[in-house]
Amino acid sequence: MLSWAITFLIIAIVAAVLGFGGIAGAATGIAKILFIVFLVLFVASFFFGRGRG
């Protein structure tokens, strides 16, 4: 799943260089959503993992 986030991030960066529009805007939106999802999962695993010792 992390590879998908990195793939969409690279597509979004290339799209930003070429100008946002069409599929570029969609890739940027997907990259933002995946970034937020992984950030939430990271924070959750950090706090729940601390209890295990």
Swiss-Prot record:
InterPro entries to which the protein is assigned, alphabetical: DUF1328
Protein location: Cell membrane
Membrane topology qualifier: Multi-pass membrane protein
One GO CC term on file: plasma membrane
Bilayer-spanning residue ranges: 4-24, 29-49
Record's keyword terms, sorted: Cell membrane, Membrane, Transmembrane, Transmembrane helix
Pfam families recorded: DUF1328
Lyase found in the keyword field: no
Entry similarity comment: Belongs to the UPF0391 family.
Protein's recorded name: UPF0391 membrane protein PP_0135
Organism name: Pseudomonas putida (strain ATCC 47054 / DSM 6125 / CFBP 8728 / NCIMB 11950 / KT2440)
